[in-house]
Amino acid sequence: MPCLSRDLVEHRLPIKAGFKPYKQPARRFNPSIYDRIKEEINRLLDAGFIRSCHYADWISNIVPIEKKDSGKIHVCIDFRDINKATPKDEYPMPIADMLINEASGHRVISFLDGNAVYNQIFMAEEDTSKTAFVCPGFVGLFEWVVMTFGLKNAGATY
């Protein structure tokens, strides 16, 4: 999937003073879902959304969510610890009426694919290791190359 240029936008994860990196203890899951988790992780690897990570100070766990219609697993990440350490982006969101007025009359309103909008914005290279997560059924760590849901200020970056 094509991403926006890093020169245009990157998602960053600055850390507030006084916070130390935290590695969440590994969670256990029902072994019956390991194959479906592995399938989803392979899909994310093939898409280029994640990559192997050899060392990380911040490690989060996955939260597998089963889709009711297909039975497939959607992999969410528990970013609570890194989100606590990240300052809130205080840039105010524009008022909806102003956005609508500015957009009216234009042919192109968005150049992002609505299907995987967050995944079209790169993570800042120096912050990718902060998105590291451990996954049952795999040996090692993975990190997000692109911005994903659940990260603090992702909505503001988008």
Which stretches of residues belong to each language-model region?
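Retroelement reverse transcriptase polymerase core
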Residues: M1-Y158
